[in-house]
């Protein structure tokens, strides 16, 4: 071993595995680009982003930590969201929650054929965030 050497596994790292997924269509109705980071509570994203906000409650983008999705003015794309894990408390952002997530408001798919997501896993579907949301 060489000092400072990093030895990694040759297997792929799965992120947000076994988290229910939701796919929504988002449109930037503003006149400036909007970027949303990986851990931002998507429900509280910029008001110029037009989407079904209630479906995004308690969720963040299903992308690697530190990454972001950019919406140019007029852009319309699908994004994949996953539920927050851990203590499920949200503070800051636009101040719309500031406390525990109200579980009764969290959208959860009812079956694998749900229009927006598969239940607990990708069921062979492709992560749409790599192109701009998840399609079977």
UniProtKB/Swiss-Prot annotation:
Q: Which InterPro entries match?
A: Urease_beta-like, Urease_betasu_sf, Urease_subunit
Which pathway does this polypeptide act in? Answer: Nitrogen metabolism; urea degradation; CO(2) and NH(3) from urea (urease route): step 1/1
Question: Where's it found, cell-wise?
Answer: Cytoplasm
Q: What class of enzyme is it?
A: hydrolase
May I have one GO cellular component term?
Answer: urease complex
For this UniProt record, give its keywords in alphabetical order, as a comma-separated list: Cytoplasm, Hydrolase
The protein in question is named Urease subunit beta
Q: Organism classification, top ranks?
A: Bacteria, Bacillati, Bacillota, Bacilli, Bacillales
State which gene encodes it. ureB
């Amino acid at each position: 071993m060489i000092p400072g050497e990093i030895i990694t596994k040759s297997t792929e790292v799965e992120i947000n595995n076994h988290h229910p997924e939701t796919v929504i269509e988002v449109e930037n109705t503003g006149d400036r680009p909007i970027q949303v980071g990986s851990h931002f509570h998507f429900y509280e994203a910029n008001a110029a982003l037009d989407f079904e906000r209630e479906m995004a409650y308690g969720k963040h983008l299903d992308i690697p930590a530190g990454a972001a999705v950019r919406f140019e003015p007029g852009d319309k794309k699908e994004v994949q969201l996953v539920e927050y894990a851990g203590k499920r408390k949200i503070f800051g952002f636009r101040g719309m929650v500031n406390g525990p997530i109200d579980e009764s408001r969290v959208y959860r798919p009812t079956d694998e054929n749900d229009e927006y997501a598969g239940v607990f896993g990708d069921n062979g579907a492709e992560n749409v965030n790599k192109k701009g949301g998840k399609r079977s």
